[in-house]
Amino acid sequence: MPHPAPTAPQIRFGIVGSGWRSAFFLRIARAVPERFAVTGLVTRSADTGRALEEEWGIRTFRTAAELLAAEAPSFVVVSVPRSAAPDVIADLVDRGVAVLTETPPGATVADLERLDALVRQGARIEVAEQYPLSPLLAAQLAIAAGGRLGRISQATVAQCHDYHGVRVMRRALGIGFEDATITASRFSSPIVAGPDRDGDPVREEIVTAEQTTARFDFGDRLGVYDFSDRQYFSWIRRNRLLVRGERGEIVDEHVSWLLDATTPTWADITRVETGQGGNLEGHHLRGLLLGSEWIHENPFAPGRLADDEIAIAQCLVEMHAHAAGGPSTNPLAEASQDHHLALLMHEAAATGKPVRSTRRAWAD
């Protein structure tokens, strides 16, 4: 069984932004209060601030200066639109604050290069790219990197959009900043609408799903991206992951590999959750097994967190360590490369022509 997580100090962080994604950080702090606390949240709207204070029991401020004057957090989460993020990040850096920003950190390559210059000057800017830390993906990527599949040559990712999908693809392939030739296309198809951010559908309705499929040819490795804009909330469009190596492959939760040239073996990735049937431990994820081997342990058990929240909570833990002088684990350069390749993918889809990436400043 997974070992209990060691006692850790409470991580106190601030938030700039009051949108939908900000609520993920607030839910984490509410679910695991011994590990996380929000020192305050910045929103320009006094009405929004009052509503958040009532719902979440937090303090809100109109400016970052007011937030920082009230209490010095370990770091500040920036959760604002990508067009506004670079200015907000730069302002916090000027105030000597470490920043964990949502994805993407900027809208354009120029934005990314501007932020890269701040990092080179000593700014502590990390990016909350949570998908590789989500329990199932973390387990799958650990298997891919662990050697039993041999050298990885191909990955097909139908998991998440744009830069998120690119990050999972790059991680599965072991790709750093190598250049790629990108081809892409779009396809529209009808689908029955599922739930959305506002809840379940109230009637059956046919809507249009916009699907982007792309190939990233890195020479000796191939990444395939496939995602529909209706996929996140759809009950009838499941996520998929294929990772192929010379000695085996991962197909979603199924793993096959060779122990030697004449001995194949297979195992499934299985979730271990409490609170099912007659189990009275509460409802949380303990971890994931590959056969009988633990390959992922939930460090926030028994907190009642969704997989995405477990991943974001891990981003907070790693950011706290970096803000205190530890290594960078979610660097701006990696997120910049993800977004850069995603922008090129959309260019290839729009023009119908192959696009070749070139090395950017953050890669050096």
Locations of the language-model features?
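Beta-strand-loop-alpha-helix segment that lines the small-molecule cofactor/substrate pocket
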Residues: A70, F75, P81-R82, P86-P132
